[in-house]
């Protein structure tokens, strides 16, 4: 599991998932992202909330690594900023293989920005039955991954490490 903060690393150390390690995710530059991907060779990348890292997403796609956005969230302000550079954002957002938006509004924005495969299951942060919703969503996440042991959850927050561990 990857994250960008010391606090999330400390939380991960307390949980102690078996057969799982924590790695800090690199800064979103081509040089560091390429080195990271070449070393870890993830089979899929899971992003949570509003994490849109252009260089990371571009390099993941270039390496044919599926990109899944969980609880995808985008504000009106952010949507308007992305729309101003639609010549870049449409290409970037179209690289996302699968998106579970957190709200109907985010679903609308993400579609307009270029995400093609979207399945709305609600905001999983407030869900009591995350696993049930994901399993009953009729989306087979396994077809997007090749069953390697390495994967990436970039820039997670305090409450998201448990979900990442459960998914892994």
Q: For each predicted feature, which ranges?
A:
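Active-site and donor-binding regions of nucleotide-sugar-utilizing enzymes
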Residues: 1-135, 156-158
């Amino acid at each position: 599991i990857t994250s960008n903060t010391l606090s999330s690393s400390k939380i991960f150390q307390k949980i102690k998932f078996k057969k799982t390690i924590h790695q800090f995710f690199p800064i979103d530059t081509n040089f560091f992202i390429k080195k990271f991907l070449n070393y870890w060779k993830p089979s899929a990348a899971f992003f949570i909330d509003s994490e849109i890292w252009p260089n990371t997403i571009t390099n993941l796609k270039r390496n044919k690594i599926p990109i899944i956005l969980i609880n995808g969230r985008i504000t009106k302000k952010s949507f308007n900023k992305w729309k101003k550079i639609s010549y870049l954002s449409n290409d970037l957002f179209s690289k996302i293989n699968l998106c579970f938006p957190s709200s109907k509004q985010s679903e609308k924005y993400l579609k307009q920005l270029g995400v093609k495969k979207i399945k709305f299951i609600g905001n999983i942060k407030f869900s009591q039955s995350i696993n049930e919703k994901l399993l009953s969503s009729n989306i087979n996440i396994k077809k997007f991954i090749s069953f390697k042991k390495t994967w990436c959850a970039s820039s997670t927050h305090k409450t998201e490490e448990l979900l990442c561990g459960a998914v892994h």
